[in-house]
Amino acid sequence: MYACARTTKINHFRGTSTTQNPNRGLEPSPSSYVTRRSKEKRPINVEKRSHKKRKIICPLEEEPIQTTPPEWLLNVMRREENGYNPKLISTRQLYKTDLKKTEARLSVPFKQVKTPDFLTEDETRIIHENAMKIRDNGVPVNFVDPELNKHVLELRKWKMKGNWIYVFVKGWKNVLDACKTLFKEDDVYPLWSFRSGTGKLCFALTPKNSGRGNSLPGGDGASTSGESGQVPLPIPPARYSSNSGQGCSGESSSSSS
């Protein structure tokens, strides 16, 4: 009996030497099941995703860009002492801020400039010095509006929201007054630059219907909408020396005498 009790005691100590999991035999809780399921990767439908195309947003333009100078512009250039070297700067859409007199400027972001080499080295330096507050004024330019009125504006560059833009100031209010019945928000106007016969930097905001076959009042009246449909590019100033006395208002100098 003593031996039996001793054996029982030894077995008792041996049995208690092994530690058992107190949660053994319990069912997993619903929360642990959801957590485990959420970690599993969901299969990707490759075939469905392969058919998706990324939407590309293009800038709004009412019509294809006309890189050939319209006749309206060529006639304006002839009146600017036989202007030359036309360049398309931007297809400019008018926004509400452009039409507000309190803003008093027309802006053209650098990213929208189609021909960036329209400035000379001196003009580039002057505009840069003005932007750096080294110089008070920018570059004075002649600006012809769609109604054929010529204005004297100033071209500068500003940095707005981290981006550089060209701005026409000091006279833009006069342009708004001259075209107050014409300019509408969201209208699109091609903005061109050219040089007058003396080399002065000029700009023209051409009207929408300034394409082939249109001539200006007071001009030579020639139409270039013939069989070829081509608009001639400006040629050296000496070719148009007979028209050098005309102004941008559409009236020749002879009519004022």
UniProtKB/Swiss-Prot annotation:
Where DNA binds (residue ranges)?
A: 115-209
- List GO molecular-function terms, semicolon-separated: DNA binding
User: Keywords in UniProt for this one?
Assistant: DNA-binding, Nucleus, Transcription, Transcription regulation
Renumbered to this chain, the Low complexity biased-composition regions fall at: 241-257
Ranges for the region named Disordered are: 5-50, 212-257
Which PANTHER family does the record match to this protein? Answer: B3 DOMAIN PLANT PROTEIN-RELATED, DOMAIN PROTEIN, PUTATIVE (DUF313)-RELATED
| The protein's name in its UniProt record | Putative B3 domain-containing protein At2g27410
What lineage does UniProt assign to this protein's organism? Eukaryota, Viridiplantae, Streptophyta, Embryophyta, Tracheophyta
